[in-house]
Regions:
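Predominantly flavin-linked oxidoreductase catalytic cores and closely associated redox partners
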Residues: 152-248, 257-258
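A Rossmann-like FAD-binding core segment of flavoenzymes
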Residues: 122-148, 152-155, 215-313, 352-362
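Beta1-alpha1 glycine-rich phosphate/pyrophosphate-binding loop at the start
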Residues: 48-125, 196, 208-234, 304
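FAD-site-proximal beta/loop scaffold in flavoenzymes
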Residues: 36, 41-48, 170, 175-192, ...
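Extreme N-terminal leader/targeting segments of oxidoreductases
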Residues: 21-57
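Residue-level detector of alpha-helix initiation sites
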Residues: 64-65, 88, 164-166, 205-206, ...
Length: 362
């Protein structure tokens, strides 16, 4: 039996992976939390290798807040629902240490725990969740065909919830300190850096918005930008340049991040002279954009110039019967709570669309 697992062995650091277990003792808790060693918490979720059923009323591609919420709503509407979770079951929140801004949790909640709760809630109403990755889709004919590494499925309706991934710096130490100082969301993690010196990487609207937001918490904020001018809107530039807590480091790129259990210094390099500088910093926020996870939908769905899925009427895509929710379309808000609301809307749209076409017997 396989379980998806995220375990926490030090503050703000999560390991992710899939393990195989032969111990029947775990049968009693196929979805739950096991606490063992002093600082180790395991979030376990039973991983099905496939589903005996191959045709569904609704197939949801991707998990996370949008996918799981959509599953809750479609299953409660008595629609046969399958979620194919993707490469990281639970999405980006599986790499977030603590979530403080999701309603209903006054003391905050660990990202993996929130995702396990959402998954269990969807499964409670009958949603089947398969931990696999979609490799190809065919939306040219109905029923829609969705192919994974291990199985092929068909569905009357599809909800795409594949999200978007933050662009990375591409240096080895970035992954090493991810969750231990390196972050990709100031709104999510800013409050954890009170009194710290902070570095923001980027020169667009997002970078400046995050820099200004972080001045509420950090002792100082340095914005490292590879050019000598900003791409951000003029009004944001004026606000950021006039902010006494923000300092700009022009024509530089981050070359390394160093520290012990947590990052302590950021190393930058001048792209013209090659001269290097070192800054003490407790946090590094990478704000160089996001990339929607839409590669498999090219030629199948209409995408915008940044490859985000375009929506027409509500959550409907360019293909009748295919809907989308969450960060795969939303490149403005990118919050767990907005993704969950988006998933709810898509599920309601799907239910009404299927009901109108009488695909499901009432």
């Amino acid at each position: 039996m396989k379980f998806s697992v995220a375990f926490h062995d030090r503050p703000n650091f999560w390991h992710l992976g899939t393990i195989s277990l032969e111990f029947t003792i775990f049968e009693a808790v196929p979805n739950g939390i096991l606490r063992g060693h002093e600082n180790v918490t395991l979030y376990l979720s039973k991983s099905e290798s496939g589903s005996k059923q191959k045709h569904y009323d609704v197939l949801i591609i991707g998990s996370g807040p949008a996918g799981y919420t959509a599953g809750v709503y479609t299953s409660r509407a008595k629609l046969a629902t399958l979620i194919i979770s993707g490469t990281l079951p639970g999405g980006q929140l599986m790499t977030t240490s603590e979530v403080e801004n999701y309603p209903g949790f006054p003391n905050g909640i660990f990202g993996p725990e929130l995702m396990m709760n959402m998954r269990q809630q969807a499964e409670r109403f009958g949603t089947m969740v398969v931990d696999d990755e979609v490799t190809k889709v065919n939306f040219k004919k109905k029923p829609f065909m969705i192919m994974t590494h291990s199985e092929n499925y068909t569905a009357e309706a599809v909800i795409v919830c594949t999200g978007a991934s933050p662009r990375k710096l591409g240096i080895p130490s970035e992954q090493q300190f991810s969750g231990r100082g390196v972050s990709y969301c100031a709104t999510c993690d800013g409050p954890f850096f009170k009194g710290e010196d902070i570095v923001v990487v980027g020169g667009g609207d997002t970078a400046l918005e995050e820099a200004m937001f972080l001045t509420k918490f950090g002792r100082s904020v340095k914005v490292v930008h590879r050019r000598d001018s900003l791409r951000a809107s003029k009004i944001l530039q004026v606000k950021a340049l006039e902010n006494p807590k923000i300092e700009f480091v022009w024509n530089n790129v981050v070359s390394d991040i160093k520290g012990d259990k947590k990052m302590a210094t950021v190393h930058v390099k001048d792209i013209s002279s090659g001269k290097e500088k070192t800054f003490n910093a407790g946090g590094l926020f990478v704000a160089i954009g996001h990339e929607p996870n839409t590669a498999i939908f090219k030629g199948q769905l209409e995408l915008d110039d940044k490859d985000y899925i375009m929506l027409g009427n509500h959550t409907r895509t360019s293909v009748e019967g295919v809907f989308a929710a969450g960060d795969v379309h939303d490149h403005r808000y990118r919050q767990a709570v907005t993704a969950a609301g988006f998933g709810c809307m898509a599920a309601i749209d799907v239910e009404r669309w299927l009901s109108e076409r009488k695909h499901v017997k009432k």
